[in-house]
A protein has these predicted regions:
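Glycine-rich, proline-tolerant flexible connector loops at the mouths of alpha/beta enzymes
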Residues: 25-59, 119
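A generic secondary-structure micro-motif detector
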Residues: 2, 48-49, 87, 125, ...
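A short, structure-level motif marking secondary-structure boundaries and short turns
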Residues: 43-45, 81-83, 119-121, 239-242
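Active-site acidic/histidine proton-transfer and metal-coordination neighborhood
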Residues: 17, 56-69, 78-186, 196, ...
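Histidine-acidic metal/acid-base catalytic patches
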Residues: 1-23, 28-32, 57-58, 64, ...
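N-terminal small/glycine-rich loop or linker at the start of catalytic domains
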Residues: 35, 70-81, 115, 231-238
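Residue-level recognition of beta-strand->loop/alpha-helix junctions
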Residues: 27-28, 74, 150
Length: 274
């Protein structure tokens, strides 16, 4: 719901209901200045949910009244940033979001695994071992699933080098799932990120079918003339652009067919960035 910045929770839910949406992935950022696009939006105050039973009851009752399910509480920071102060703040708020997800009966949190941009992949995997076990333990205690989106968070020079999210490819997924062997950790699957990384976006659905907890519908358009000029080492936004489903390069028939094949029956949310 980050696309509806400035709207109240009630306005957002009313709009979703009027437009016929069955579910929404609700932004739950803390009150802070946004450092990037779509960050800093909060339609549910996670900390208040945990402290105020009346507020929590209102959130649940309004969703029921609107006839719109909350698919997940969404918070997408970089919990492995090299900035220790920002890292600790992000971890603490993520824990609050997990607790709020339990209290609201949502049972799902969507987020990033994060990445220290001063370290390589192997060093970041070591950092996963250090940072994530207590978070996963809390999720297990709360019976909340954590779905990591496969977005590299690498678009322009502000996310260079390496991007701000480690968990972006099937080989890295395999490594992370070995380190964090938990039924409560899975994937928020977005096919569009694989398009510009030149990765097969269908095959991983079959291999990781038991780890697909949540799904995004977002498209990416590759501008071949630009790619052939600047090459794959350029900033991604120099040769691609996010699109709403149907206006990019994802084959939605194949994608939905694969989701049907694996028996996925969870929520699918349209992510709008264009």
């Amino acid at each position: 719901t980050s696309i509806l910045d400035g709207w109240t929770y009630e306005q957002m839910m009313d709009f979703a209901s009027e437009q016929g949406f069955e579910c929404v992935e609700v932004a739950c950022w803390p009150e802070e200045k946004a450092e990037r696009r779509y960050a800093g939006v909060s339609h549910i105050d996670a900390e208040r949910v945990n402290q105020d039973d009346e507020y929590a009851a209102h959130i649940m009752a309004y969703a029921e009244k609107a006839g719109v399910e909350i698919s997940a509480l969404a918070y997408y920071p970089n919990v492995m940033t090299a900035d220790k102060e920002k890292r600790n703040a992000a971890i603490e708020h993520l824990k609050n979001v997990i607790r709020a997800s339990k209290k609201l009966g949502v049972g799902m949190v969507t987020t990033f695994i994060g990445r220290d941009q001063t370290k390589n992949v192997r060093e970041n995997l070591e950092l996963v071992k250090e940072i994530w076990p207590p978070i996963i333990k809390l999720a297990e205690v709360c019976d909340v699933k954590i779905a990591i989106e496969n977005c590299p968070m690498l678009f322009g020079e502000e996310q260079w080098p390496g991007g701000q999210n480690l968990m972006t490819t099937p080989p890295i997924w395999r490594e992370v799932f070995k380190i964090l062997d938990s039924d409560n950790l899975g994937i928020n699957y977005d096919p569009s990120h694989f398009i510009w990384q030149m990765i097969d976006y269908i095959r991983p659905l079959y291999e990781f079918k038991d780890k697909i907890f949540h799904v995004h519908y977002k498209d990416i358009k590759i501008y071949r003339d630009k790619l052939e000029s600047c090459g794959i080492m350029a900033y991604p936004l120099e040769y691609m652009s996010p699109k709403i489903p149907g206006l990019g390069d994802v084959d939605w028939g194949k994608y939905v067919s694969a989701l049907t094949d694996i028996g996925y029956d969870g929520c699918t949310c349209i992510e709008i960035e264009d």
